[in-house]
């Protein structure tokens, strides 16, 4: 898969009409988990802790569970290809009520402070943010994570001043569920407020790493960029017909700031 649509080698300076997909003053709506934060370690360790706790709980009842812990590569492959959590639990050696017990532990674990600290900045994000800032393009984060969590993360990496606004959730458990209707509602609120503040969002794009991000952008007729560095694979994302698929935020910004020929 190519990250960016290949361009003609013809010098753009020799062509009369050229334009940019994103120009100075425009707004880029961007998801947080996946495009900006690498959450793979946190999600995998949440899985491991939930599996271990379930096994220990049954051991206290004198019941030995034949647990098979997946490797991180196996686990993340399943997550990227939208394998249900029930199937992941089944592959891990659980069945019946054991699966229910395992799944009930995840929401409480995934937002523990000790696990949140495992999130890492995706490669190339700092340069991508700087590129957008230097071009006068505003970054507005639309996420199902709590805004306070996002802001803490951005401060940790000295990136908070590069973001114009954060639209997040009040509920800490909303992000893991990643329901499309929630992302649509968040993006709708973000667009409405940006317009009230006097910013034109008609040329905006939506960038994200899940079907929820793509569907939200499409709901408001925004072109969408799907990133494969997060929790969904390229093959899965293409099924939702995004405008373009890129590897990460860095390649997405390159794509969005390249000149295109006006016909």
At which residue positions do the language-model features occur?
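N-terminal helical cap/lid subdomain that shapes the substrate entry/recognition surface
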Residues: 16, 22-123
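Conserved Rossmann-like nucleotide-cofactor binding loop
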Residues: 35, 42, 147, 212, ...
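Short beta->alpha linker loops
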Residues: 42, 120-124, 145, 209, ...
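Conserved donor sugar-nucleotide recognition element shared by glycan-biosynthetic enzymes
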Residues: 43, 121, 180-183, 187, ...
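Short, acidic loop-to-helix structural element flanking the phosphoryl-transfer center
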Residues: 111-141, 147-151
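Surface-exposed amphipathic alpha-helices with a cationic face
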Residues: 126-133, 191, 214-218
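Substrate-recognition "cap/lid" segment bordering the active-site pocket of phosphatases
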Residues: 140, 147-205, 218-219, 236-238
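Acidic, Mg2+-coordinating phosphoryl-transfer loop and its flanking beta/alpha structural elements
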Residues: 206-245
């Amino acid at each position: 898969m190519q990250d960016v649509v290949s361009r003609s080698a013809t010098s753009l300076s020799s062509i009369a009409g050229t334009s940019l997909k994103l120009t100075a003053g425009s707004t880029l709506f961007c998801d947080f988990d996946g495009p900006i934060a690498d959450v793979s370690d946190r999600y995998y360790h949440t899985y491991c802790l939930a599996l271990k706790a379930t096994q220990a709980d049954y051991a206290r009842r004198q019941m030995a569970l034949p647990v098979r812990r997946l490797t991180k590569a196996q686990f993340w492959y399943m997550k990227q290809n939208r394998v249900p959590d029930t199937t992941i639990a089944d592959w891990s050696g659980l069945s019946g009520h054991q699966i229910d017990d395992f799944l009930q532990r995840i929401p409480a674990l995934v937002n523990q402070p000790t696990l949140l600290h495992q999130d890492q900045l995706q490669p190339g994000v700092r340069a991508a943010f700087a590129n957008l800032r230097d071009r006068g393009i505003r970054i507005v984060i639309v996420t199902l994570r709590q805004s306070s969590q996002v802001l803490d993360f951005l401060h940790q990496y000295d990136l908070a001043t590069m973001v114009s606004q954060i639209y997040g959730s009040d509920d800490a458990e909303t992000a893991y569920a990643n329901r499309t209707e929630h992302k649509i509602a968040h993006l709708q609120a973000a667009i409405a407020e940006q317009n009230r503040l006097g910013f034109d969002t008609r040329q905006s794009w939506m960038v994200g790493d899940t079907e929820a991000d793509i569907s939200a952008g499409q709901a408001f007729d925004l072109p969408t960029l799907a990133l494969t560095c997060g929790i969904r694979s390229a093959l899965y994302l293409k099924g939702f017909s995004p405008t373009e698929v890129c590897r990460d935020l860095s390649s997405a910004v390159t794509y969005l700031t390249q000149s295109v020929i006006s016909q």
